[in-house]
Swiss-Prot record:
It is found in: Cytoplasm. Gene3D superfamilies: 2.40.280.10. It comes from Rickettsia bellii (strain OSU 85-389). Residues 131-151 are annotated as: Disordered. GO terms for biological process: trans-translation. PROSITE patterns: SSRP (PS01317). InterPro entries: SmpB, SsrA-bd_prot, SsrA-bd_prot_CS. The keyword Cell membrane does not apply. The keyword Cell wall biogenesis/degradation does not apply. Required for rescue of stalled ribosomes mediated by trans-translation. Binds to transfer-messenger RNA (tmRNA), required for stable association of tmRNA with ribosomes. tmRNA and SmpB together mimic tRNA shape, replacing the anticodon stem-loop with SmpB. tmRNA is encoded by the ssrA gene; the 2 termini fold to resemble tRNA(Ala) and it encodes a 'tag peptide', a short internal open reading frame. During trans-translation Ala-aminoacylated tmRNA acts like a tRNA, entering the A-site of stalled ribosomes, displacing the stalled mRNA. Belongs to the SmpB family. GO terms for molecular function: RNA binding. The gene is smpB. This is SsrA-binding protein. The lineage of its organism: Bacteria, Pseudomonadati, Pseudomonadota, Alphaproteobacteria, Rickettsiales.
Length: 151
């Protein structure tokens, strides 16, 4: 089992999308952003990634300002470049060109070498009836575990 110290998770992504494939990417950050992430002050709830030319950027990821960085602080929602291999970038570009597919941030974490990584998912949006179905499944599993505990 590999070591992951999770900084932020996007739990809504699993509810709103069918995750078809997962990728790990590095992320280009400034010093004040790294310090803020070490304190756990990040949110990737509404973040997504998109390609611009031959690069992939993470948009709408909120990393809070670091209090001690004063005038050298960063912008909280700036686009951040993701570090991927050329083959992975080409795969992402090909899959996101298909209608209905998007690239969603699933989690942000420190790996065992203490580098900040982001887990991306190539995802297809769920329809309303799919969301209702997943709610029913979750409720049924919860009820099953309650019944087992009572016996």
């Amino acid at each position: 089992m590999e070591y992951k110290k999770i900084i932020a998770q996007n739990k809504k992504a699993l509810f709103n999308y069918f995750i078809e494939e997962r990728l790990e990417a590095g992320i280009v950050l400034k010093g004040s952003e790294v310090q803020s992430l070490r304190q756990g002050k990040a949110s990737i709830e509404e973040s997504h990634a998109a390609d611009t030319g031959n690069e992939v950027f993470l948009y709408n990821c909120h990393i809070a300002e670091y209090e001690k960085a004063n005038r050298f602080n960063h912008s909280t929602r700036r686009p951040r470049k993701l570090l991927l291999h050329k083959k992975e970038i080409n795969k992402i570009i090909g899959r996101t060109k298909i209608k209905g597919y998007t690239l969603v941030a699933l989690s942000m974490y420190f790996n065992k070498k203490n580098k900040i990584k982001i887990e991306l998912g190539i995802a297809k949006g769920k329809k309303l009836h799919d969301k209702r179905e997943s709610i029913k499944e979750k409720d049924w599993k919860r009820d099953q575990s309650r019944l087992i505990r009572q016996k």
